[in-house]
């Protein structure tokens, strides 16, 4: 059953499905594993942290207090095309978790974030 509303439970499910895809991806997996680690415990912490980020973005709640853009700026350079892969995997995950209306709400936000990060990384960040 797909979620018809965005809530903490649905965001947690999204994080589980999405990051399982990321970890297995031939392009994104190595970048994320190098930055986060390879243990399930390290990934559990990351999923909770990013879940809090999305809860803040989508629900106005959560206790995220990181600097996601800085984290990306600190990564070794990677091809800009990897953002397309990230968005594809994110949309696939949204399709599993949410109905069409909620998927589109979250996807629009994800596309805006990806666009902003790309501008900052590739126009101004030296990637």
From Swiss-Prot:
The keyword tRNA processing does not apply. GO terms for molecular function: heme binding; metal ion binding; oxygen binding. The keyword Transport applies. Keywords: Cytoplasm, Heme, Iron, Metal-binding, Transport. Its cofactor is heme. Belongs to the truncated hemoglobin family. Group III subfamily. Monomer. Pfam families: Bac_globin. It comes from Campylobacter jejuni subsp. jejuni serotype O:2 (strain ATCC 700819 / NCTC 11168). This is Group 3 truncated hemoglobin ctb. Heme binds at residues 64, 72. InterPro entries: Globin-like_sf, Globin/Proto, Hemoglobin_trunc. Disruption phenotype: Cells lacking this gene grow less well than wild-type under conditions of high aeration. GO terms for cellular component: cytoplasm. The lineage of its organism: Bacteria, Pseudomonadati, Campylobacterota, Epsilonproteobacteria, Campylobacterales. Induction: Constitutively expressed, it is further induced by S-nitrosoglutathione (GSNO) and S-nitroso-N-acetylpenicillamine (SNAP) (at protein level). Its main location: cytoplasm. Binds 1 heme group per subunit; upon expression in E.coli it purifies predominantly in the Fe(2+)-oxy form, binding O(2) tightly even under anaerobic conditions. It comes from the Bacteria. It is found in: Cytoplasm. Has been suggested to be involved in cytochrome c peroxidase or P450-like oxygen chemistry or cyanide detoxification. The high oxygen affinity of this protein suggests that it probably does not function as an oxygen transporter.
């Amino acid at each position: 059953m797909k979620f018809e509303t965005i809530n903490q439970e649905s965001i947690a499910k999204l994080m589980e499905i999405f990051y399982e895809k990321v970890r297995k991806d031939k392009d994104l997996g190595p970048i994320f594993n190098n930055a986060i680690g390879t243990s399930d415990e390290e990934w559990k912490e990351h999923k909770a942290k990013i879940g809090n980020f999305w809860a803040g973005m989508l629900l106005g709640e959560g206790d995220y207090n990181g600097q996601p853009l800085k984290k990306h700026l600190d990564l070794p350079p990677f091809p800009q095309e990897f953002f397309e892969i990230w968005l594809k995997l994110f949309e696939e995950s949204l399709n599993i978790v949410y109905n069409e209306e909620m998927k589109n709400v979250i996807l629009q936000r994800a596309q805006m974030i990806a666009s902003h990060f790309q501008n900052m990384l590739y126009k101004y960040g030296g990637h």
